[in-house]
Regions:
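Ser/Thr/Asn(+Pro)-rich, low-complexity disordered segments
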Residues: 62-309
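Extracellular polysaccharide-recognition and catalytic grooves
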Residues: 1-105, 110
């Protein structure tokens, strides 16, 4: 509106700059037409049905991506305006390469660190939070997708016990207690480090992985470890406190719980090895959990230190 209707050239310049910055960020989040990655506020429907996120419509108008959910006034005004996003955003938004696009950003007055890594076959994004170590909010801090929307994966601490309750944060979205996420390329560690009093006051005493395991071609679940394959992409997920399948039939196929709120999760994605090679390599790599870090001797990256804060 300011870009089109303002009579002040300086204000128009600010408006264009704000739009350019927004669409540059969208281009990093865009994966097959879906806006992924860490978000300041996420709702259950955004996470469970990523093709219907309302903001996907901006990608549709800007780059011709496939999803145009029921829209509202702002995207309509954008579509009718003369504004065109920077040409440099198209390649990033429609990234179609096996070589990863890797970009890190520090944003806002709190210096929030965001990481985006994606190829044509997968997306891996994360964010820090000013609330780390404290009661949480609806922030979505880790987002992974392999293939299409059925291959979406994230880890969080439920903010309430009611699966489809009304609290914020909820069961699927945000964190009741906020972890620290440390990402290195296509790997990350998620640290939950909370005092006994914080743990006792939490409504839910476990963290969980949300993943539609039946959407993957192969899976191996053993104790602390989960191995997955979808196409040529492999995933290794490890929770220090173990992985448990919930008793509820409704949740058993797409949720794994890890008890306690002093816990470390580790996630590694790879598309360079066969599934059997990947399983063998990750079973033999050293994963050492310490109070202030997680040390992993990765078969490809070498020794990686993931700091817990």
């Amino acid at each position: 509106t300011l870009l089109v209707l303002s009579d002040d050239d300086e204000m128009k310049g600010y408006a264009r700059r704000a739009l350019d910055m927004t669409f540059d960020l969208f281009s990093l989040q865009c994966y097959h037409g879906m806006l992924l990655g860490s978000n300041g506020r996420a709702y259950p429907n955004d996470l469970l049905s990523p093709t219907t996120v309302q903001a996907n419509v901006y990608c549709y108008f800007a780059w011709g991506t496939p999803y145009m959910p029921g829209t509202y006034r702002t995207p309509l005004l954008y579509a009718l305006s003369p504004y065109e996003c920077p040409p440099s955003t198209r390649k990033k938004a429609l990234w179609d390469d096996d070589v990863p696009l890797v970009e890190k950003r520090v944003q806002g007055s709190e210096g929030v660190q965001t990481v985006f890594v994606k190829t044509k076959s997968w997306f891996f994004g994360s964010s820090s939070s000013p609330l780390e170590g404290k009661p949480g909010s609806q922030e979505h801090l880790l987002d992974i997708m392999v293939g299409d929307g059925k291959g979406r994966i994230w880890i969080n601490h439920p903010g309430e016990a009611d699966v489809f309750g009304s609290k914020r944060p909820g069961y699927f979205n945000g964190n009741g207690l906020t972890p620290h996420v440390s990402q290195f390329l296509s790997s990350c560690a998620v640290f939950y480090r909370f005092s006994s009093s914080d743990q006792s006051s939490a409504e839910v005493g476990y963290t969980h992985l949300i993943c539609r395991r039946d959407a993957f071609d192969e899976q191996i679940l053993e104790g602390k470890e989960l191995f997955l394959r979808r196409g040529t992409v492999n995933l290794y997920i490890r929770a220090e406190n173990g992985l448990e399948v919930p008793s509820s039939p409704f949740l058993s196929s797409f949720e794994l719980r890890s008890p306690g709120l002093w816990n470390s999760w580790y996630v590694r994605l790879d598309d360079s090895l066969s599934f059997s090679e990947f399983v063998k390599a990750m079973r033999h790599c050293d994963v050492v959990g310490k109070r202030d870090c997680l040390l992993v001797r990765d078969p490809v990256y070498g020794l990686v230190r993931y700091a817990s804060k």
